[in-house]
Amino acid sequence: MMNLYLNMLKIAHRGYTKYHSDNSLQAFYDAIFYKFDMIELDIQLDKHDNIMIMHDIHIDYQFVETMSYEEIKRQYPNTLLLSSFFQQFDYTNTKLYFDLKGGNKLTKILHDFLVKYNINIENMWFASFNLNHIDFLQNANPNYKLGLITDNLFTLDIMQNIISKYNIQFVCFFWVLLNDKMVSFLKSNNIMTFVYTLKDLKLLPWIQKYNIDGIVTDIYYD
């Protein structure tokens, strides 16, 4: 039987979370152990502008950006600071896809952090739903590899405007939006197409029809 995943990057959604909580150090280690090609992780700010690895932008309708890291840790003890992640994880040998969450100021603080600590960004991609994030990073350092995450199906002229302006390496679509015209257009411009999030292998017969480059997945597969 043909391997449906042969040419697709396996992207561990918030790490491999079958046995550990989302965005935890243990989930990131498991993604390596189970040989995922890339790890997707979410980052945002607390109220003191610490960069945390965390997905949800509110906790019981209180915005995370109004809470301290200590408050968040009391409810979610596995929450990591980005600084701790870089100290404890061999990020130079793993492809990382950062999903930027929250307000616009995240990118300024992130850029300053990467410069201050001389972080090797060779295996890093920075992506967001928020074009303000992409715009800032593009101007701060043209060498940043950027991605657009979207629930929108743009017309080709709008997508052309976006990829002409920004150094977009991939576009990650919600899986229901896949269509041949957009995938072919992106490939013709040397831009990868990713989809999110594979939660059930029953989706594969549909996804495999498209010549995409990567799947953000909760599921381990061979």
Task: Report the location of each language-model feature.
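Phosphate-group recognition and catalysis centered on beta-loop-alpha active-site segments
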Residues: 1-222
